[in-house]
Each structure stands twice: as structure tokens, then as C-alpha cells.
Amino acid sequence: MPVFFLYFSQRLSLSQVLRLEAIYYLCIVLVEVPSGYFSDRYGRRLTLLIASAALFVAYVIFFFGDNFGEFAVAQAFLAVGLAFNSGTDTSLHYDSLASLGRESEFGDREAIVARNSMLAGGLAAVIGGAVAVFELRYAYLLSAGMALVTLMVVLKIAEPESHKKTLLPEKPATQLKICLGLLRHPLLAWIFAFYVLITVLNHIPYEFYQPYLAMVLQKGTSLASGTPLSTGIHFGAAMFIASFFAAFSSRLCQRIGLKRLLLSLVAFQTLTILAMGLTLNFLIVVLVLFRTVPRALMTAPMNAAIAPLVGSSQRATFLSIQSLAGRLAFAGFLAGLSLVASESGQAQWSPLSTQLLISAGFGITGLFALSLFGKGK
């Protein structure tokens, strides 16, 4: 959704916008892990049905909403929708291949999934940005329509046979203990730490490129009606670029190694954030076009490394725990950044620059720690 920051900023102060984002991530805390257990216990199909329905409700509320309270409710439904999808989509993919005895194809197929997902996301961003030139809320109407289409598609999905045999996982407390115990595996623990760090770093350019782009194009003046199209095209271009890299992510990982690949992605994203924080320049806008490349290159190799190490009856729960840790880390980080945000409705360069430089410092520290943690393992 390339217009959410602009849409909220029309009606709320920057600090309120950041708090709305924090509310979303904190709501994830309530449903992320239970949604993973629900998927392991009741099946992938039902979980995805709930996810699609919740997203539809969220976008409808966004479309009709006009104040902080209504947007907060919509954020809660959005959290439910994305949490119930998180981990279950990957688990459904692996379980489906396992049912066919084709698990070895998972990594390469995940790369194709990532590529296609980003191509679709890029197209949606351009269309949403164009529609939002006339009215920002129309982008949410289109999103509601697509959520409804997704719901119809999920109704046609069958539960994988391999997962039907494991639909009775341990009791919730025991399941949680088993999943956390999996972190004794050195590779799973390292990937878990990487995921928490990169979740924070990947979201920083995504959250702040809209006001940054507006300042570059308009030298800090108020957001004009052309900005949604500009941000939509920019977001779409970023997704199209990322889709190119996603297509060969599995092969790149095989060539240079998983840890080396993932560490290089942390370094790249940190440098991007640092550049954004140092200056307002159109060349940085071009650099930020590559901000989604780390997610494109990490998704398939990371999932391919995790899936065989975690059993089907724990896989969605484990992935949900990992996702929760990353989202919770970003929620706390975002709440902290809101303390140095402007209280006015218009984003200003000085506090924005400070937020970005703080984020870059966090990335440098995390990269150093992750490099040390990964040595010899």
C-alpha cells in the first residue's frame, strides 16, 4: 500500500501516524503465535480463510474511517489478517510439496513465489498510487476488492495430505516450549537473530521513503496531490527491481553461502538508511529503489534452510514466533523513534534525519553482533 503514510498524515500528526504503526505491531503480539498454533492445529486452509476475511474488513474500515480511533481498529484487523497469513503460506507450500515427495524443489519454488509476489505488489502499487491521485482512500477500496478475491481463491485450496497427519500438535504451552527449544540448533538460532534485525532495518526505508520523497520533490512543502502517484511509481519500481533479484536468490545462496548472503543484506540496508539520514538528494531516491532487494534475496534461502529443520506440526508456530520477535522489535523501535518525531501534521527534515541516523546506528551495531555470533558456526 504506497499511500498509507500520506493517507494517515492528511488526518493525523506524524507522531500519531507512528503510534498507529506501533499499535499494529503491538496487536501482532496478541495473535501472531496463536495464529501459528491455530494453523498447526486446525489446518492451513482455515487459517488462510480467516486471514483473507480479516484483511477485507480492515481495508473497508480504512476506506470509511476518518479519525485515530477508527484507524486503530482497522490496524487491529490488519494485524490479524497478516498474522494469520504469516508462516502459514510458507508451511502450506512446503507441506504441499511434501505430499508429492518433492521437498527438494522448495527453495527454487520459493524464489519463484517471491518473484511473482513482488511483481504483483509492484503492479498494485502503481495502480493504487494512480487512483490515490484522485482520492487517497480509493486505494483501500481496491485493496478490499483484492482481499475478497483472495478469499474466493483460498476457498478452492485443499489441505495438504502431509499436514493432515499432524493436525494434533502438543498443547499450546508444550508447543511453545518445543519451538523455543529448536533455537538450540545453531543455524536456527542465527537465522532467528538475523530475522529480528533485518525486520527492523527493512521497515525503516519503507516507513520513511514517502515523506522523504515528498521533501526531495517539493523541498519540504506540504504534500501535494501528485505525491501518491510519485510514491506509487517509486514503490512499484522498487518491487519490480526486487522481483528480478528474487528469481535467482536460491542460486546466489548456493554460490556464496547462506550467512554471507544474509550479512551482506544487513550491510546494504544499513547503508541505505544512513544515506537517507545524511542528505536530501534525488540520487538517494534512486538508491532507495533497491530497498526491497534484501527481502527479495533473503526469503527463499531463509525459508529453505528453516523448513527441513522444523517438523510440520511445529512449522507454522515456529515461523510465527520468529515473525513475532521481528515485529515486536520493530514496534518498540518505532515507538522510540516517535519520541523524536514532529507533532505537526507535516513531516520535517530535522526530526526525520535524526530518526534515520538512529536507525543506521542500530543497523551497524546489529551487523557487528551478528557477524561475531555467526563465526565458526
Regions inferred by a protein language model and the residue ranges of each:
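Helix-loop boundary and gating motifs at the non-cytosolic
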Residues: M1-L30, F63, L187-A224, S230-F235, ...
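Transmembrane alpha-helices of Major Facilitator/SLC transporters
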Residues: L30, S230-C253
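C-terminal ends and interior cores of transmembrane alpha-helices
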Residues: A53-N67, A267-L280
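Cytoplasmic helix-loop-helix junction between adjacent transmembrane helices
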Residues: A76-M118
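A membrane-interface helix-boundary motif in multi-pass transporters
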Residues: A130-G145, T221-L229, A341-T365
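Helix-loop junctions on the cytosolic side of multi-pass membrane transporters
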Residues: L136-A139, S143-E170, S371-K377
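Juxtamembrane intracellular "pre-TM" segments in multi-pass secondary transporters
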Residues: I157-A193
